[in-house]
């Protein structure tokens, strides 16, 4: 499945004049706070961090939204190929490489950015006590519609209430969310 998606992203980006890499790696916080490189399809324009800095400097509303949610609802940095991948959660597919290497599991808390550690506050220890997952509580309970604080509450709930049946339930809910495209992008 990675091969056809990779070919799609490559050609779609090239048709739009984007010569950047197809894949994107980013340091994330793993189990017990150990950092690892997480793989994703690149869904944003090159220089996305600089673009975000400029947007936040020019527009206080964007700055407030990003500081509250750690994301933008209508992020102008997303490429058209990236929008399609995010709507179907296909941008996460390369994370199976991280699962293969034992850095992630299929289901678990979201792998947070190292710069978000401070913002995680009291939730940090519980969230990093288990392997991060490709999907989990917040992905199956609203995805991008969930605030950063609510994500942490959901991830802590997962840690404190983990069971095989919770994982089965989350997997089914994630499939439903992806099929109906709720909370994507």
Q: Over which residues does each language-model region extend?
A:
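Short, glycine-rich, amphipathic interfacial segments at transmembrane boundaries or analogous
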Residues: 23-76, 135-154
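C-terminal terminal-structure detector
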Residues: 122-185
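Residue-level detector of functionally special positions within alpha-helical transmembrane segments
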Residues: 2-4, 89, 133
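Gly/Ser/Thr-rich helix-start
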Residues: 21, 31, 83, 103, ...
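Short amphipathic alpha-helical interaction/hinge segments
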Residues: 49-52, 108-111, 183
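A short, structured surface patch at a secondary-structure boundary
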Residues: 65-130, 170-177
């Amino acid at each position: 499945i990675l091969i056809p998606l990779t070919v799609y992203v490559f050609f779609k980006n090239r048709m739009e004049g984007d010569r950047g890499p197809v894949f994107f790696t980013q340091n994330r916080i793993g189990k017990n706070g150990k950092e690892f490189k997480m793989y994703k399809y690149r869904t944003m324009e090159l220089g996305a961090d600089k673009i975000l800095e400029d947007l936040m400097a020019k527009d206080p509303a964007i700055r407030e939204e990003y500081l509250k949610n750690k994301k933008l609802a209508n992020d102008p940095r997303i490429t058209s190929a990236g929008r399609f991948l995010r709507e179907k959660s296909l941008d996460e597919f390369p994370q199976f490489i991280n699962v293969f290497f034992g850095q992630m599991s299929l289901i678990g808390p979201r792998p947070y950015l190292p710069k978000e550690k401070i913002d995680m506050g009291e939730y940090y220890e519980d969230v990093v006590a288990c392997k991060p997952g490709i999907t989990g509580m917040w992905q199956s309970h609203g995805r991008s519609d969930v605030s950063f604080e609510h994500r942490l509450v959901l991830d802590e709930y997962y840690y404190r209430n983990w069971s095989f049946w919770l994982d089965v339930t989350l997997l089914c809910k994630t499939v439903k969310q992806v099929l109906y495209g709720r909370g994507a992008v």
